[in-house]
């Protein structure tokens, strides 16, 4: 689903049922529940891009895209947002690799004079990217700061954060040049032995860290929307097995939620 949100209000703007590949290829099951012939298998991040494009085509203004790590770890998803000139703040896994400041891939090998000249950047055993967990875990204590981002039901929401400008490194050995520099943000929750939450962001380099963290944390509104849609508006009460019926049910739940 796609939700439009700010710090004061949020509402789902688009949603689509994810169809597993096994279902997408099974004609009998598709026919039994009325899946349209035009619906093909798409990964969740591809569906997300389609919904973003659809909402933008309706004339809604562009805004930073927020997504959890299920989407943020997909380099193709992040690249597609950049191609659309849409800045993002997306969750990533602790294993995501980046080039820290002052460290970049090696240039292409020198040409031997035979065949096509090498054009891909390189890594070596001594020059390679680092997982974001290792980078954050070994950062000096002075680089971690307590920052507050909103008032919650139990008081001010505050945690310890680390941020740095880095280059994402995923499969860049297949590229001709390094990726652009963007933000890495890490959060070290109280009581945890290591940092546990990480984000990448293409917001401008002069973006205040407080704004970056507010955006990263804005997903709480989306989670709250789902809790209310399920608990108070019956989104998860649909008992049918029809494609159209499910989407009609979901549309009515969301319309009622937006109205109230």
Q: What label would you give each PLM region?
A:
Residues 76, 201, 209-216, 231-248:
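Short, solvent-exposed helix-loop connector elements
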Residues 250-260:
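Short, hydrophobic/amphipathic alpha-helical patches that form generic packing surfaces
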Residues 5-41, 89-93, 98-221:
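An anionic, glycine-rich sequence signature occurring as long contiguous blocks
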Residues 57, 76-87:
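Short, surface-exposed basic-aromatic patches at helix termini and helix-loop junctions that form
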Residues 1-2, 64-71, 88, 199, ...:
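Short, conserved catalytic/metal-binding motifs centered on acidic residues
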Residues 39-63:
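Short, basic/hydrophobic alpha-helical segments
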Residues 73-79, 98-103:
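A short acidic (Asp/Glu
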Residues 67-74, 94-96:
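Acidic, metal-coordinating catalytic cores used for nucleic-acid/nucleotide bond scission
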């Amino acid at each position: 689903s796609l939700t439009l949100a700010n710090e004061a209000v949020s509402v789902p703007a688009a949603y689509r049922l994810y169809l597993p590949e096994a279902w997408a290829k099974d004609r009998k099951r598709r026919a039994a529940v009325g899946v349209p012939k035009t619906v093909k298998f798409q990964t969740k991040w591809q569906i997300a891009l389609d919904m973003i494009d659809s909402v933008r085509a309706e004339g809604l203004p562009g805004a930073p895209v927020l997504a959890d790590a299920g989407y943020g770890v997909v380099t193709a998803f992040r690249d597609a947002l950049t191609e659309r000139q849409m800045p993002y703040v997306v969750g990533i896994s602790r294993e995501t690799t980046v080039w820290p400041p002052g460290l970049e891939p090696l240039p292409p090998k020198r040409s031997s004079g035979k065949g096509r000249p090498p054009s891909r950047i390189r890594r070596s055993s001594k020059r390679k990217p680092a997982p974001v967990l290792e980078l954050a875990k070994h950062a000096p204590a002075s680089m971690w700061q307590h920052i507050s981002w909103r008032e919650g039901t139990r008081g001010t929401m505050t945690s310890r954060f680390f941020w740095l400008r880095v280059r994402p490194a995923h499969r860049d050995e297949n590229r001709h040049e390094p990726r652009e520099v963007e933000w890495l943000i890490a959060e070290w929750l109280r009581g945890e032995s290591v940092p546990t939450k990480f984000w990448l962001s293409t917001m401008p380099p002069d973006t205040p860290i407080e704004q970056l963290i507010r955006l990263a944390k804005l997903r709480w509104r989306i989670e709250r929307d789902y809790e209310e849609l399920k608990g108070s508006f019956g989104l998860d009460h649909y008992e049918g097995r029809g494609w159209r019926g499910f989407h009609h049910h979901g549309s009515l739940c969301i319309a009622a939620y937006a109205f109230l």
